[in-house]
């Protein structure tokens, strides 16, 4: 089950459960749409995977399965970002 992390790992922007700006990779690294698509160019700096919009957990399920409140703010090193982008940005996600 997804944690539904509450913020962008790079810039720290709030991304509550209801946010349509949240993007995740297959390991649930969480970024805002601006960081994921503009800064990172759809390449996760941790795994090299792509990003997809994070699903919104229905309100009726939040009491039983609450979204995480743990802030994860780990701004990525520019060198690491560039290294991953150069390696993967021209390769379609299904071919990485």
Regions found by a protein language model. Name each.
Residues 2-96:
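Intrinsically disordered, low-complexity regulatory regions in eukaryotic proteins
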